[in-house]
Amino acid sequence: MEAFKNKVWLSSPTMHGEELKYMTEAYETNWMSTVGANINEVERITAEKISCKYAVALSAGTAALHLCMKLAGIKPGDKVFCTDMTFDATVNPVVYEGGVPVFIDTEYDTWNMDPIALEKAFEIYPEVKVVVVAHLYGTPGKIDEIRAICQRHDAIIIEDAAESLGASYKGVQTGTFGHYNACLLYTSPS
């Protein structure tokens, strides 16, 4: 088989305006990573867009989800309910903290976590105190039902909105429904 002559990019870089200026500024001021004026501005604009009080820019969506797991207090051996149809970065941080993912089936309407399956899972594992909800392919899950179930069981919601930046549920931007939320500014997490 002959090798491809050209690369096929998932998302080729596009420059439409002042991107090169901002990249050069970051390079010249030696603020290429996690701090600096450009990062502060990204955080401000993101918080404004999502309608939340604060946003913290990290290196990747996985890092954001890992921070969420730490903030939620997951300890070794803790079971954590997770959406079963998602990118592995949704679940890997649970394992990084020593937690045990328990996968919750998806439902037909949105392909996201099934509230009925979540309720049944709480019957089997009433000790679970963290639920990781992901919105697949830009489609929000059934947040009202999931929040009500989690509230009844005193469970923290970690919202993985990596695939749903710009999507809303009942007029509210995803990335604001959990106790801890992670969004992504990349074209696709998978």
Task: Report residues per predicted region.
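N-terminal "arm"/small-domain region of PLP-dependent enzymes with the aminotransferase-like
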Residues: 1-32
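Phosphate-binding glycine-rich loop
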Residues: 35-79, 93-95, 103
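Short beta-strand segments
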Residues: 59, 132-134, 182-184
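PLP-dependent aminotransferase-like
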Residues: 70-152, 156-161, 168
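Active-site nucleotide-sugar/metal-binding loop of Leloir-type enzymes
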Residues: 176
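Conserved small/polar residues in nucleotide/adenosyl-binding loops
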Residues: 186-190
